[in-house]
Amino acid sequence: MPPTAPPEKMMFQLILRRRGISDQAVLRAMEEVPREEFVLPADRADAYRDSAMAIACGQTISQPFVVAYMTEQLKLQKSHRVLEIGTGSGYQAAVLARLTDHVLTVERFRTLADRARERLEKLNCFNVEVMLGDGYALPAGAGQFDRIIVTAAMEDIPQSLLDRLEPDGILIAPVGPHHGVQRLVRVTRTGDRFDRKELVDVRFVPAIPGIAREL
């Protein structure tokens, strides 16, 4: 990190390291993405606090540690094709864009999708495609993915989403009740087998099927 970096950003990186984030590429991506561009204007001064924050449409921008942790668990390579379910502010997609060549991110709220697209274009994240759609019912033409990240809580991971994984692919998602604590789950595909590992407790807004009729 440059010696002229703001103190709050230097502390931000220190917190991530102290909490166990060790992948240098992930840390660098977290450093490069300006989180203040993704929070509400009233929250810009607190953008580097390690906490989730409210955004539009009743949604949230995830806690930075959780973003870094989920990204690290994906074990990304540049050639990977990544699917994100739940664009939100676009922050997670911007981090992914620095680590892999192609990201498709799907959002059910038009307002969030449009604003995220604008932010990502402003930051030259031209390898990210923002789609207004239903994460539970992707179009057949969306294809297969090396990595899938879900940023809203699912009560269970649908088989249709698991089937989108390429062989040796990894999916990570919060699984559990829509209100309360969920478990972050990592699923690895080996042939037709899906090996599941529970990681840590998290709290995410619920994943809702369908495209929002308003907002």
UniProtKB/Swiss-Prot annotation:
Pfam families: PCMT. It catalyses: [protein]-L-isoaspartate + S-adenosyl-L-methionine = [protein]-L-isoaspartate alpha-methyl ester + S-adenosyl-L-homocysteine. It comes from the Bacteria. The keyword Methyltransferase applies. It is found in: Cytoplasm. This is Protein-L-isoaspartate O-methyltransferase. Belongs to the methyltransferase superfamily. L-isoaspartyl/D-aspartyl protein methyltransferase family. The keyword GTP-binding does not apply. The active site is at S62. One of its GO terms (biological process) is methylation. GO terms for cellular component: cytoplasm. The gene is pcm. Catalyzes the methyl esterification of L-isoaspartyl residues in peptides and proteins that result from spontaneous decomposition of normal L-aspartyl and L-asparaginyl residues. It plays a role in the repair and/or degradation of damaged proteins. One of its GO terms (molecular function) is protein-L-isoaspartate (D-aspartate) O-methyltransferase activity. It comes from Bradyrhizobium sp. (strain ORS 278). Its main location: cytoplasm. NCBIfam families: pimt (TIGR00080), PRK00312.1 (NF001453).
